[in-house]
Regions:
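Short secondary-structure boundary/capping segments
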Residues: 55-56, 113-117, 154-159
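Distinct, well-ordered alpha-helical segments
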Residues: 51-57, 81-89, 151-153
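Alpha-helical packing segments of well-folded alpha/beta enzyme cores
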Residues: 23, 27, 55, 121-124, ...
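Short, acidic, metal-binding catalytic loop of nucleotide-sugar glycosyltransferases
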Residues: 58-64, 131-132
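Core AdoMet radical
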Residues: 2-22, 34-51, 62-82, 90-123, ...
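Catalytic domains of carbohydrate-active enzymes, especially glycoside hydrolases
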Residues: 30-31
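Phosphate/oxyanion-binding loops and surfaces in catalytic or ligand/nucleic-acid-binding neighborhoods
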Residues: 2, 131, 158-165
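Catalytic cores of alpha/beta
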Residues: 146-162
Length: 174
């Protein structure tokens, strides 16, 4: 990775510094001044970021959650942090949508996505379905890879079982 110019140490440090001093501060300011209308939580795993949980709680505390639309791309490996539960927060907001990343079901999904506990993912997804008021609030985000091609039928069956849509994207390896 260090051979790639955008990953070279000085640039990486500059980006991190910019993110920490500029981007995060602008986000915090937008929360505190109630100017945020939409948040798209993605990249890495947003539910692992303490900032996510603090910001969501703060928006509710400030009393303007009903004016904010919240979207996620998440692997749903976590749905709570320090006693705060995602699916208790989301109904407080104007609207929300979760696209949950999954590459396959069961052992195949666990093989493709390192760290996936499929049964835990399934419990978390069903927990979201229980609070969802519309079909688009909880969707499967299926990345089709070579091993994942073997999972097409299982993923379709899962979407039928859960009564949810599948959004697909193809992963190219070149």
């Amino acid at each position: 990775k260090d051979s790639q110019p955008w990953m070279a140490s000085p640039l990486r440090e500059q980006i991190t510094h910019f993110q920490d001093t500029q981007v995060v501060q602008e986000f915090v300011d937008a929360v505190e001044t109630k100017t945020i209308k939409e948040i798209y939580w993605c990249g890495g795993e947003p539910l692992m970021w303490e900032m996510h949980w603090k910001a969501m709680q703060r928006i509710i505390e400030l009393g303007f959650a009903k004016e904010v639309y919240v979207r996620y791309n998440t692997n749903l490996s976590r749905t709570s942090l320090k006693g705060i539960k995602l699916f208790d927060l989301l109904p407080e907001f104007q609207d929300w949508q979760i696209c949950s990343s999954l590459d396959g079901t069961g052992e195949v999904g666990e093989y493709i996505r390192d760290g996936l506990n499929y049964e835990q993912w399934l419990r978390n997804f069903k927990e979201g379905l229980a609070v969802a008021k519309t079909a688009r609030e909880m969707r499967l985000d299926y990345t089709i890879t070579m091993p994942g091609l073997l999972e097409l039928k299982n993923m379709f069956d899962l979407s039928q079982e859960l009564n949810t849509e599948i959004l697909t994207k193809v992963m190219f390896t070149f």
